Amino acid sequence: MAQRLTSAFLNWREHITPASKTSDFENTGMISPEEFVLAGDYLVSKFPTWSWECGDRIRGFLPKDKQYLVTRHVFCVQRNINIGVNEEWVDIETDDTRNKDDDQDDDAISSIHSDTSDIASAERLKGQSKELSDSGPLPLKDEEDDDQMVSPVIKEDEGRYYDLYIVYDKYYRTPRLFLRGWNAGGQLLTMKDIYEDVSGEHAGKTVTMEPFPHYHSHNTMASVHPCKHASVLLKLIKQHRERNDPIRVDQYMVLFLKFVSTMLPYFEIDYTIQA
């Protein structure tokens, strides 16, 4: 019950927060609704699998035809692991805890820049999903394996597919990710299933079931709480600037996807672009 009340309060707080009209993403890691649209347009132009949608609940601070971004049928390799988390609810950040764990921001940065085993595994499997539905199980070979060891076979019923949604959060002034998944048989995934596809650092910490703000009904989805988004993205923006490779505000969404991919290492999320 406490988790439900906390979630309801946070959603109410976001609802009553006025939309920002200022621009200061280089110093805050946050963006305005206008910059959200600008960055979304850039994402759609560079990655045609993403598109704008309006839903059936229009939020007045965004253009009617550009309410949120969506990409569908994103392949995810199913992991056979156990995560000790509640079936429906996990911990989320509140104002009392938001400022006490900057070390987690550094961990997120390290996750983005390091070649973790999760991401390495996902990269070896990337590109295979498009053939699954046509050819069935595929044997995969590890290109870096000099000992010619055979990697596990991905069976058709082991793959999962997700629709990913990016909305604008008025309170945190950042994008927010929602996701809904199905197994290969078309059955909707439970929260426990979804936790299996989230990195161990994030599963059971910042992922909750939340109402999707652009649907009136049947709108509950898994969502990554955005309380840390701005601080992590700001550090990435500063790192690019220090390397004389500054990030423009229209490229912000690509950087956001790079950050998101560390939480979802088994998802085929493409953010590699010479922007």
UniProtKB/Swiss-Prot annotation:
Disruption phenotype: Impairs atg8-processing. A 1,2-diacylglycero-3-phosphoethanolamine binds at residues 1-10. Its main location: cytoplasm. Keywords: Autophagy, Cytoplasm, Nucleus, Protein transport, Transport, Ubl conjugation pathway. One of its GO terms (biological process) is macroautophagy. Residues 123-149 are annotated as: Disordered. GO terms for molecular function: Atg8-family conjugating enzyme activity. InterPro entries: Atg3/Atg10. Residues 123-133 have a biased composition (Basic and acidic residues). It is found in: Cytoplasm; Nucleus. The keyword Protein transport applies. Coiled coil: none annotated. Residues 231-251 are annotated as: Handle region. Disulfide bonds: none annotated. Residues 83-156 are annotated as: Flexible region. GO terms for cellular component: cytosol; nucleus; phagophore assembly site. The active site is at 227 (glycyl thioester intermediate). PANTHER family: UBIQUITIN-LIKE-CONJUGATING ENZYME ATG3. Belongs to the ATG3 family. E2 conjugating enzyme required for the cytoplasm to vacuole transport (Cvt) and autophagy. Required for selective autophagic degradation of the nucleus (nucleophagy) as well as for mitophagy which contributes to regulate mitochondrial quantity and quality by eliminating the mitochondria to a basal level to fulfill cellular energy requirements and preventing excess ROS production. Responsible for the E2-like covalent binding of phosphatidylethanolamine to the C-terminal Gly of atg8. Monomer. Interacts with atg8 through an intermediate thioester bond through the C-terminal Gly of atg8. Also interacts with the 40 amino acid C-terminal region of the E1-like atg7 enzyme. Also interacts with the atg12-atg5 conjugate. The N-terminal region is involved in phosphatidylethanolamine-binding and is required for atg8-PE conjugation. This is Autophagy-related protein 3. It comes from Schizosaccharomyces pombe (strain 972 / ATCC 24843) (Fission yeast).
